[in-house]
Structure formats: C-alpha cells, structure tokens
From Swiss-Prot:
The lineage of its organism: Bacteria, Bacillati, Cyanobacteriota, Cyanophyceae, Nostocales. The keyword S-adenosyl-L-methionine applies. The gene is rsmA. It is found in: Cytoplasm. This is Ribosomal RNA small subunit methyltransferase A. Specifically dimethylates two adjacent adenosines (A1518 and A1519) in the loop of a conserved hairpin near the 3'-end of 16S rRNA in the 30S particle. May play a critical role in biogenesis of 30S subunits. CDD domains: AdoMet_MTases (cd02440).
Length: 271
C-alpha cells in the first residue's frame, strides 16, 4: 500500500457510508463518461467503473499511478493520465482516446488545498464560463468550503466564492463526512456537495463588471457595501440603486443574493 504523502495533501477515504453517498449523488448511468480527479488508491474508482461507459482519472502521484495501472489497467473503460489536473491539457491528451473525450460528469475526492482552483477550472469564471459545462460535479471537499458554496445571502458563510459559483451552478449539500472517515484523519471535517451547471436565468450584461464588483464588494466584508464600492460609484447614487432593488442601503456584501448582485451590476452598466 502506498502511504499518504503530505506534499499532495493525501488522505485515503475509508468510509463505506461516504463512498455510498458519493456514488448515489453521481447518479451514474451506462452512458456516462466520468472524470475523477485524484483517484488515490482507487477506492472510489472501483465503485464507479462498473456503472459507467468510461472513467478518466487524473493523478499527480507517480507511485499511485503505478498502483492504479497494476490494479485497473486491464479495464477497457478506464484511462489514467499522470499529471497535475490544474495544468493538464485534457483535450490534447485525449486526441487518440475518443472513448474518454468530453466527460459529462465529475466525481472526485479532491485535495483541499487546491479546491478553489479546481472548481474554477471545472466551472470557469463569471466572465469566462466553461463553454462545455458538465452535467454534474460531485465533490468531497472541506466542510467549511462546502458551506460557502451553497450558503444563502445573509448567512455568515456567504461570500465572493458563493456568488461566483452560484452564478454558474446550482449547489446542493449531500452529506457530512467526519475526519475519522479518512486515513490519516485530516484536521478538518468534510462534506459531499453536488454542483449542477445551468443556464443563467438573468445573465449579467457585462460579466467582467459583475466579477470585479463582487471582488470589490467583499473586499472588506464587515463594511457597508456603499463604502466598499465607492471607488466605482458615488455612495449616494449606490444607496438609490440599492433602494431600487429593495435592498437596505446599509447592507453589507453578504446580505445581497447572487441574483441581486447581477441586477446591481446591470444597473451600474447603464449609468
């Protein structure tokens, strides 16, 4: 057995209950092509393979790649790419593997220290969304980050990440996963979430403006929004716009829903 390596933030999932929850949330069918990021020892991979048409796994650890090839390399619906998912060009690497091209779902237990960059690569950004969105993305991530993904406006966990992700996808909590479900146990609890990329109901007229507005608005979270945005709009004018949207002029960034952020950006766009 390959030992978990701290440099890659590795923790082996061992809970059958958590694995059951992940597989159920993935809603796999025999037509699905799955992308798994960081398969580790393959405990989740082995659960998924009998259920899907194809599974593409991306693993950075060479020792784990050797283990996975030895154990699963003979499976016709399994393909392993060795490399860093954040920098790997999947399209180029899959040119000669048509069966594994354009995966439609993601199912993964990802390294917690790069959760944000991974989600951004999967979803894209407000200004540059993924042009070929996945049907669903099921992730096992740090609980604190999970809470920010599906947080509602007005809650203590609602922030810039909430807005950026919720603009592009519906976010759903699946289950909690305690630290004891892993070897070695991480210092934090975890959770399974499901993201479903969707068509934007009321899109921002200028997505880049919205992106910048959200960044500025959450720059100093405890301050009122009209203070955080005074570099782009006069305070009194912002108060008028907020009232027009039925938002308290003394609201803070976390009090404003994702849709209200879009509406505010659109109003500022016609100033």
């Amino acid at each position: 057995m390959v030992r978990p390596r701290r440099v890659f933030a590795q923790h082996w999932l061992k809970s059958e209950k958590a694995l059951d929850a992940i597989v159920k949330a993935a809603e796999c069918s025999t037509n699905d092509r799955i992308l798994e990021i960081g398969p580790g020892t393959g405990i989740l991979t082995r659960r998924l393979l009998p259920l899907v048409e194809a599974l593409l796994a991306v693993e950075i650890d060479r020792d784990l790649c050797k283990l996975l090839v030895k154990q699963l390399g003979q499976k016709e619906n399994f393909l392993l790419l060795q490399g860093d998912f954040l920098t790997l060009d999947l399209v180029a690497n899959l040119l000669t593997f048509p069966k594994f091209q354009k995966p439609n779902k993601v199912v993964a237990n990802i390294p917690y220290n790069i959760t944000g960059p991974i989600i951004e690569k999967l979803l894209g950004t407000i200004a540059n969304p993924n042009p070929e969105p996945f049907d669903s993305i099921v992730l096992l991530i740090q609980k604190e980050v999970a809470e920010r993904l599906y947080a509602k406006a007005g809650s203590r966990t609602f922030g810039a990440l909430s807005v950026r992700v919720q603009y592009l996808a519906d976010c759903e909590f699946i289950c909690d996963v305690p630290a004891g479900a892993f070897h070695p146990p991480p210092k934090v609890d975890s959770a399974v979430v499901r993201l479903r990329p969707r068509q934007i109901q009321i899109p921002a007229r200028d997505p880049k403006r919205l992106e910048n507005l959200v960044k500025l608005g959450f720059g100093a979270k405890r301050k009122m929004l009209r203070n955080n945005l005074q570099s782009v709009v006069d305070r009194d004018r912002l108060s008028q716009l907020l009232e027009q949207l039925n938002i308290n002029p003394q609201a803070r960034a976390e009090d404003i829903s994702t849709q209200q952020w879009v509406e505010l950006a659109n109003l500022l766009g016609v100033e």
